[in-house]
């Protein structure tokens, strides 16, 4: 299964509570921090919530 590299590129200052919680669930706390997550519906839903705060790249497993 494919994996996604998710990098936070914008601050959560001024972001709504749900967006902050979505970033925390993804494991992101600081700008330029990256995590690799499995590509599934749950992860895609979290990314959709914060698409304006993150960059997403597909990583070959």
Swiss-Prot record:
Keyword Ribosomal protein: yes
Subunit structure: Part of the 50S ribosomal subunit.
InterPro entries: Ribo_uL30_ferredoxin-like_sf, Ribosomal_uL30_bac-type, Ribosomal_uL30_CS, Ribosomal_uL30_ferredoxin-like
UniProt source species: Mycolicibacterium gilvum (strain PYR-GCK) (Mycobacterium gilvum (strain PYR-GCK))
Protein known as: Large ribosomal subunit protein uL30
Keyword Cytoplasm belongs to the record: no
GO terms, biological process: translation
Record keywords, A-Z: Ribonucleoprotein, Ribosomal protein
One Pfam family, short name: Ribosomal_L30
């Amino acid at each position: 299964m494919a994996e996604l590299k998710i990098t936070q590129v914008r601050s959560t200052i001024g972001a709504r509570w749900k967006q902050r919680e979505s970033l925390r669930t993804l494991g992101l706390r600081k700008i330029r921090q990256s995590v690799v997550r499995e590509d599934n519906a749950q992860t895609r839903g979290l990314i959709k919530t914060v698409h304006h705060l993150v960059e997403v790249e597909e990583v070959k497993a």
